[in-house]
Amino acid sequence: RQWSRGLGDVYKRQLLWGGSLGIFCGLVGGKIDDVVMRIIDAFLSIPWILAMLLIVSLLGTTTLVLIPALGFFYGKGIVRVARAATHDVIAKDFIVSARARGHSNMSIIWNEILPNVRDAIMVEGAMRWSWMLLGFSSLSFLGFGVSPPTPDWGLMISNARGLMSFAYWAVLAPIFGLSSLIIGINLTADAFAKALGIDRSTKAPV
């Protein structure tokens, strides 16, 4: 179960790096914001599956390679969401007041911006975490993910394909497990968004 714990850790890591960079760019603006976002746009234009195939061909298919790489590619969209949420917040009067009182950017981020954008970032991160789980299993199904004896639903589905004619349940069981987990995460994230009053239909394009 080491890889499953790693996928849980990478959820926090993608929130940390994506949220931090997005908040920073949204606050400072200017040329730094433009340069960083153009770099993010360039990475977003690259199909994740092609990038992952290149990475595993160069660095291997260990969880130490797969999990951080997936966390990076699925965390890029959080940068845009955090940046858009920060733009909405910095126009508020309490941000103007904090700047007038001489608060540093770090103080404004920690005390004023983060509490107001945290929920949107967490909801987006949960949705992307479910996509990352699907991506991880897809790589294993194609033979570019983890190898036995590491347990993985994509690997189980791939190994059981030859049993479809007489033992279809060997394929259906991991499909059901993976689907249930992904749907459960998405439904939980949607419920969380509704409870917090977050309209995901108007979030920043990613």
Map each language-model feature to its residues.
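Single conserved hydrophobic/aromatic residue that forms the stacking wall/gate
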Residues: 1-11
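Generic hydrophobic transmembrane alpha-helix motif, especially the helices
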Residues: 13-18, 26-89
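Non-cytoplasmic
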Residues: 50-54, 62-67, 71-75, 80, ...
